[in-house]
A protein has these predicted regions:
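Secreted/periplasmic proteins
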Residues: 2-114
């Protein structure tokens, strides 16, 4: 009986931790380093669908959805940031254009694959 209860609790903990790590919401901003390098060592390309996130592994693909208009785009994490309170992701101008915004916007994030 205790084994079943323990297994059920472990399964619930795994499901809860996975679901909470899979989604995030907050403010997205647009950034471009002007040809510099990202934290992953890549050259910044404002025409690519890439982004900066504080903790997701480099190479993670994230669906970003603009909460204002419902548009979404899949970006690849290749940099670190944003380092401004309340912001959850920095997007290249190409990704921001695909989402239909400039400046700041409220977004939902969902990990597509790591």
């Amino acid at each position: 009986m205790f084994v079943r209860l323990g297994a059920a609790l472990c399964a619930a903990a795994i499901i809860f931790s996975c679901s909470s790590a899979m989604a995030e919401s907050g403010i997205a901003s647009v950034y471009a380093h002007g040809g510099g390098r990202t934290a992953s060592g890549e050259r910044v390309n404002s025409r690519e669908l890439t982004a900066a996130h504080r903790s997701l592994p480099f190479g993670t693909h994230v669906r970003v959805t603009n909460r204002r208009n419902g548009r979404s785009v899949i970006v690849r994490i290749n940099d670190r940031g944003p380092f401004v309170r309340g912001r959850v992701i920095d997007l290249t101008p190409a990704a921001a254009h695909a989402l239909g915004f400039s400046g700041l916007v409220r977004v939902n994030l969902e990990i597509v694959r790591t």
